[in-house]
């Protein structure tokens, strides 16, 4: 598996570095730091003097970036795989997406780039930064967003919205991305339309039949995962998809949510599916998003 680790020196970025200990040895590991160098304007300074200032600034930023990459390389787990360092200038999201394509990456790993957090309860809302959003929607491969220290990688929650979602998840899991064995809980949520009216036996029977169909679907996917070496079982519930995913992740104390980024109706390449969007803004643990 080819892995691209994008770093920026933030706490979440270092958490992403440490999270690599839970992933399989990479055939090729690229350490990338993208420099978004914005030169200040000097309207009252002669051009030749401003040029000297800009050159000094560029050199200082590059040296800082090289030191960051050296430190990251020193923190890699022993089994991380052969690594190379890349220091590039440009808008981070564009550089990361381009590098992922150039290196034919199977996985991008990065810390959550957030604008801030809202909410006073146990589940805060993360305002996903534009860099994270663009990478999630435009990257050619799966992306792991790490939102804090990762202490384990055993319990994986895999929400599925349909057959295409399941096929994409299986393709990714066939890469055997994890270092140690994991337990996968597959979850499918039948959107709630409200309880049947009292005495409406036909509506109640129809709702039960739909839930049984979803249970059969998720059990079938779990069986396919077991066939390729995973511990897996399925759960089918009724409710609001994003809420049920977050609830299940909290109940199971999931170490990772593995999910698709697009809705069932073919959300465009530049817009996250509504369920993925909601989960990413309140993620209780790292999220690994696949296409």
Please place each PLM-identified region on the residue numbering:
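Small/aliphatic-rich secondary-structure junction motif
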Residues: 1-52, 155-204, 222-233
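Glycine-rich, Arg-bearing micro-motifs that act as flexible, cationic patches
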Residues: 111-134, 153, 256-282
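A short acidic, glycine-rich active-site loop
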Residues: 51-67, 204-216
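Short secondary-structure boundary segments
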Residues: 33, 112-113, 188, 260-262, ...
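Structural beta-alpha unit
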Residues: 39, 55-59, 63, 67, ...
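Short, structured interface segments
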Residues: 128-149
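General small-molecule cofactor/ligand-binding pocket signal
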Residues: 30-32, 84-88, 144, 185-187, ...
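Short, flexible loop segments at boundaries between secondary-structure elements
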Residues: 143, 281-291
């Amino acid at each position: 598996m080819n892995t691209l680790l994008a770093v920026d020196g933030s706490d979440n970025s270092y958490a992403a570095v440490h999270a690599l200990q839970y992933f399989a040895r990479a055939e090729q590991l690229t350490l990338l730091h993208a420099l978004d160098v914005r030169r200040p304007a000097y309207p009252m300074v002669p051009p030749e003097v401003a040029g000297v200032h800009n050159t000094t600034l560029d050199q200082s930023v590059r040296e800082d970036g090289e030191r960051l990459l050296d430190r990251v390389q020193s923190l890699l787990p022993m089994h991380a795989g052969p690594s190379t360092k890349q220091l590039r200038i440009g808008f981070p999201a564009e550089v990361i997406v381009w590098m992922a394509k150039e290196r034919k990456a199977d996985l991008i790993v990065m810390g959550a780039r957030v604008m801030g957090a809202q909410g006073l309860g146990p589940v805060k809302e993360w305002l996903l930064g534009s860099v994270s959003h663009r990478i999630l929607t435009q990257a050619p491969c799966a992306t792991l967003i790490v939102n804090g220290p990762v202490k384990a990688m055993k319990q994986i929650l895999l929400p599925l919205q349909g057959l295409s979602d399941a096929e994409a998840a299986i393709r990714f899991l066939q890469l055997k991305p994890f270092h140690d064995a994991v337990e996968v809980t597959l979850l499918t949520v039948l959107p709630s339309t409200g309880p049947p009216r009292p005495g409406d036996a036909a509506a109640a029977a129809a709702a039960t039949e739909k839930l049984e169909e979803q249970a059969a679907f998720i059990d079938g996917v779990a069986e396919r995962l077991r066939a390729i070496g995973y511990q897996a079982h399925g759960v089918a519930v009724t409710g609001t998809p994003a809420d049920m995913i977050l609830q299940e992740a909290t109940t199971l104390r999931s170490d990772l949510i593995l999910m698709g980024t697009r809705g069932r109706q073919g959300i465009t390449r530049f817009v996250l599916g509504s369920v993925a969007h909601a989960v990413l803004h309140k993620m209780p643990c790292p999220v690994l998003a696949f296409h």
